[in-house]
């Protein structure tokens, strides 16, 4: 199966499925709004995580770099920006984590939809198109893909996206501390390693030669500077933290048991790129808990 999270416009009709899935509501006191910036604790103090060492290796294979700016656009220049998109939840998500206990809810797609991958798939032609990587190449062993990152790519807290964030993804997904056996197994059995050549060049190596490597190796980054070294407090510590992302929207406000609000970034690094232009047009998206189906359809 593919681990590629195919980026779609976050607010397509697909997300209407959210109203059909009942989550268990949180028991926090109503009436208290919690707004926590990415990288900060609930008390408003910024964490200073210990960062794992970054190891680089020389790139020894000569490859043919590929890119794709020839696919038809699937957005309209006439699209009007602004406004608020409103969606309903039958109950509030149990966590903002996307891995670990209670994370496998339908609301998770709203968070993952704002985390880009190395490459994307064109929705009409099904050809590879750039996302965080501008170029890619295939190794002769038929199990390695090479990538060149867009130097402009940034996390939502302004930190540059680097090859180290993709190597960190492998360590993160294999960690026992995230309490996610499926991810532990997949990232061990399917991906052998991530090689870092420099800040913007890397290789992702599969455990075996296989067709359609791009569907398996076009992984997403994990913000190394945000998490640092993991420990057994991961599940509780990051339950409600807003993790930096690379996509066009970020959680801006939430009240447990009531609502979650997303806001479009004013200066998103990818807004003028060919396959991102004229998309992601609403300014805000609000998910509101409506527990009564009759009220929901009124």
Pin down the residues of each PLM region.
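Aromatic- and charge-enriched surface segment that lines or borders ligand/interaction sites
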Residues: 134-179, 197, 203, 296-298
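Surface-exposed binding/hinge segments that line
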Residues: 184-231, 248, 253-255
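N-terminal lobe/hinge region of extracytoplasmic solute-binding protein
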Residues: 55, 59-74, 83-140, 171, ...
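Extracellular/periplasmic solute-recognition and catalytic clefts
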Residues: 176, 180, 193-196, 252-263, ...
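Gly/Pro-rich hinge or "lid" segments in bacterial periplasmic/extracellular proteins
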Residues: 109, 115-116, 122-127, 218-284, ...
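C-terminal motif of bacterial Sec signal peptides marking the signal peptidase cleavage site
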Residues: 22-25
């Amino acid at each position: 199966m593919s681990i590629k999270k195919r980026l779609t416009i976050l607010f397509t009709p697909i997300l209407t499925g959210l109203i059909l899935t009942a989550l268990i509501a949180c028991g926090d006191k109503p009436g208290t709004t919690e707004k926590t910036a990415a990288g900060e604790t609930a008390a408003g103090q910024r964490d200073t995580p210990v960062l794992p060492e970054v190891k680089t290796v020389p790139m020894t294979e000569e490859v043919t770099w590929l890119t794709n700016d020839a696919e038809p656009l699937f957005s309209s220049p006439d699209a009007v920006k602004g406004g608020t998109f409103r969606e309903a939840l039958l109950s509030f998500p149990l966590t903002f984590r996307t891995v670990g206990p209670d994370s496998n809810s339908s609301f998770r797609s709203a968070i993952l939809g704002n985390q880009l991958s190395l490459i994307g798939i064109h929705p009409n032609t099904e050809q590879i198109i750039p996302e965080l990587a501008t170029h890619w190449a295939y190794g002769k062993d038929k199990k390695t893909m090479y990538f060149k990152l867009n130097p402009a790519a940034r996390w939502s807290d302004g930190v540059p996206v680097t090859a180290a964030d993709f190597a960190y993804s492998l360590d993160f997904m294999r960690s026992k501390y995230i309490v996610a056996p499926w991810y532990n197994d997949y990232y061990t059995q399917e991906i052998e390693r991530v090689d870092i050549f420099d800040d913007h060049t890397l290789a992702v190596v599969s455990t075996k030669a296989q067709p359609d490597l791009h569907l398996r190796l076009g992984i997403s980054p994990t913000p190394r500077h945000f998490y640092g070294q993991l420990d057994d407090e991961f599940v509780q510590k990051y339950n409600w933290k807003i993790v930096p992302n690379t996509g066009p929207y970020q959680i801006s406000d939430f009240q447990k048991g009531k609502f979650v609000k997303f806001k479009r970034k004013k200066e998103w690094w990818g807004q003028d790129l060919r396959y991102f232009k004229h998309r992601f047009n609403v300014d805000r998206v609000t998910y509101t808990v409506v527990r009564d189906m009759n009220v929901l359809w009124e």
